[in-house]
Amino acid sequence: MFHQIYSIHVMIDGTMTPVVYALLPGESQFVSTRFFTLLKEHMSRLNLSFTPTRAFADFEVAVHNAIRQVIPGIIIKGCFFHFTQCVWKKAQTTGLQIFYRDNEEVRTLIRRAAVLPPIPLDRMEDVWFQALEDLEDADIPHNTQPFTDYITEQWVEGDRLVWNHFGTEGTRTTNNIEAWHGKLKRKAQHSHPNIFTIIQTFKEIQNSNDINRIQREAGGTIRPRAKKYLNILPSSCHPERKIPEQSNRFDDLADSASQLLHLG
């Protein structure tokens, strides 16, 4: 009857909090559009506004199209972490991961691709094409073209506004939501729980969130984010702290930031 659990989370007092829980029968654009339409209608009946200006979502075209159809003008951003996963998965399918650990030039190529999101849009092509030029003199015992073609065609020539995070304020990943789904699975204690177990789990999680919210409002402490996540995107992501826009500086920035990524 149901194919997936879908949740919507919002930032409340600096904490990403689930506010909508849904059981969907599929992953198609029709299903996603129907879900967001019903949600919008339900909120209207409750006299609540449903006019978000920005949404974070996985890189799923069906979901993006559905959100844009129901909420015209919304800005959709993809998860930076999922972007790096897409890059690493392509490195695996094209055979480059075999050389990643021992070949510095392969490692640099993959990392430069993975760290494109924090580079300014008007400099991003320069950084990537510089990486391609560097390949001409590289000693790589494997064909890199399937990988570089994928990065160029899928991302550099694709919808850059979705995955580029230069200037993005606040969170740039959905890692906290992934952690929430992990918590949900542990609480359900079954790989295929029945609907009653799922609903009960939703209630328990919501009760826990309500308690945490009350504690925060009463002045309780909030567990700080891990420092590595705070620092993973450097100052280039914030317009007020731009570095001088020379191409070689952004090459250096890409290489430096890539050291914070955990690939392989």
Positions of the model-derived regions?
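C-terminal interaction modules of eukaryotic adaptor/scaffold proteins
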Residues: 250-251
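Extended amphipathic alpha-helical interaction segments
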Residues: 41-242, 262-264
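Electropositive, glycine- and tryptophan-enriched low-complexity nucleic-acid-binding patches
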Residues: 1-48
